C-alpha cells in the first residue's frame, strides 16, 4: 500500500521517516488484553521499527527503489545491537526452514540494513549511540531528540542527546554530519 509513496519519495530524492506507533492496546502476551507497565512504548516501539525494517528489506522494496532513503527512529531500533543475530538467523532460516527470502535479494541482507539512516533519539544513552554509530557510521546518522516527550517538555532528552553525541570519540567533521550535515543533505536544504 505504500508503493506510491516510495515512488514519489524516490522521485524527489527525499527520505521516508519511520516512527513506531504501537499502542497500549497491543498486548505483550496473548493471554492479556493490553500491554502493561509501559512495555509497549519502551520495548514494543523498537521491535515495531525493527519489524518494519525487516519487511522493507525482505519484501524487495529496497531493490525496487535502490535510491530510497529511510530514517529510522531510536537509532535503527534493535538492528545495530542484534545485527549478527540477524545474519545468523537468516542463514539458519534458509538452510533449515527452506526460506527463500535471502535468495530473492540482489545482495546480502545486512548490506540493506546498513543503507538505513538512524536518528539519535536514544534519550542520551551513550552506549546505544556508540552501537548505532558502529553499525551505521556517522554518514547515516541524523540528530533527533524525541522532543517534547520527556518529563521536562523535551529539554531533558535534548540536553542528554547533545551530551551523548559530544562525548563520542569521533572527529569534529563526523559530529557536524550527525548534528546537521546529514539532515541538510538528505532534505536538500543547501540548494
Per-segment meaning from a language model:
Residues 1-142:
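Catalytic pocket-lining loop regions of alpha/beta-barrel enzymes
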